Every structure is written in structure tokens, then in C-alpha cells.
């Protein structure tokens, strides 16, 4: 049976030297006394550039493989969701959803402007801000009217 003894805070002082395992020694390791061959700096730089280029190519390939199928599906998903909303609620539901989305967008823009007060733009400074919104509403109304006629 082992005997109970006090342990020091430093574990190395507690364990006798003959009980400490020695690190394994490899037979073919070069000693520090052997001269290290000179490494050509240009070889390292060229090799590093090739590795970086190869890693960039691998990253681009992974990006294309993983992201492309999802990006291709987005327009189809948007049309499908619009069709489902139209079939469930009709044109009024689409307009209600559009108005709710635009209201949420306006509230989000307002909250960001409150957080960054230096970025405020008064309406008379840029009258062209209204044009894209009017164009978007006009296109959506035209598309809904086209769907109603079919």
C-alpha cells in the first residue's frame, strides 16, 4: 500500500528524480552541433507564393461549389413564395405584405439613423431618394395587375 505523505506545491519537488520518466530519444535526430544548411530566401518566398495561390484557388472552388447552387435557387424561391402568398391571400394580401415590409424597412432605416445621428439626410438635400421607391412600387403594382388579369 502506498504511504501518505505531504505534497509540495511544486510537483517536481514531490517526485524523486529516479521516478521521473525521461523523454524518448530518436536515434536519427541531428544534433545541434551539426551545421544547418543555408536556406535560400528566394526559394522560401516562391514556395510561399505558390502555396498562397493554391489555397486561394481551393477557396474559390469551394465558394463556387457551395454558394452557386443556393444563388441559382433564390429567384425560384422568391417567385414560389410570391405565388403561395397570392394563392392564399390574393392581391390584397400581397399589397398588405408589401406595405408591411416597406414599413419595417422604414423603421429599420430610422433606427439606424438614430444610432448614427451624423448620417442624417434631410429630404430637400436629395430629392432622388424617392424615385427608386416609387419605381419599385410601380413595378410591383404592374406585376400584380398582370397576375390579376391572367
Curated annotation (Swiss-Prot):
Post-translational modification: Proteolytically cleaved by RHBDL4/RHBDD1. RHBDL4/RHBDD1-induced cleavage is a necessary step prior its degradation by the proteosome-dependent mechanism. Ubiquitinated by the ECS(ASB11) complex in response to endoplasmic reticulum stress, leading to substrate recognition by the segregase p97/VCP and degradation by the proteasome.
Places the protein is found: Endomembrane system; Mitochondrion membrane
GO cellular component: Bcl-2 family protein complex; endomembrane system; mitochondrial envelope; mitochondrial membrane
Region called Leucine-zipper, residue ranges: 127-148
Source domain of life: Eukaryota
Spans traversing the lipid bilayer: 127-147
Position of sequence motif BH3: 51-65
Keyword Ubl conjugation: yes
PANTHER family: BCL-2-INTERACTING KILLER (PTHR15018:SF1)
Name of this chain's protein: Bcl-2-interacting killer
Organism: Mus musculus (Mouse)
Taxonomic classification: Eukaryota, Metazoa, Chordata, Craniata, Vertebrata
Amino acid at each position: 500500500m502506498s504511504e501518505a505523505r505531504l505534497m509540495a506545491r511544486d510537483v517536481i519537488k514531490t517526485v524523486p528524480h529516479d521516478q521521473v520518466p525521461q523523454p524518448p530519444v530518436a536515434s536519427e535526430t541531428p544534433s545541434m552541433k551539426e551545421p544547418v544548411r543555408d536556406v535560400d530566401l528566394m526559394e522560401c518566398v516562391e514556395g510561399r507564393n505558390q502555396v498562397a495561390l493554391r489555397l486561394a484557388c481551393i477557396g474559390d472552388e469551394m465558394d463556387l461549389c457551395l454558394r452557386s447552387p443556393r444563388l441559382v435557387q433564390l429567384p425560384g424561391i422568391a417567385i414560389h413564395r410570391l405565388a403561395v402568398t397570392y394563392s392564399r391571400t390574393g392581391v390584397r394580401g400581397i399589397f398588405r405584405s408589401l406595405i408591411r415590409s416597406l414599413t419595417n424597412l422604414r423603421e429599420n432605416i430610422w433606427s439606424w439613423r438614430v444610432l448614427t445621428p451624423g448620417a442624417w439626410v434631410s429630404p430637400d438635400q436629395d430629392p432622388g431618394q424617392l424615385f427608386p421607391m416609387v419605381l419599385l412600387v410601380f413595378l410591383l403594382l404592374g406585376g400584380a395587375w398582370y397576375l390579376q388579369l391572367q
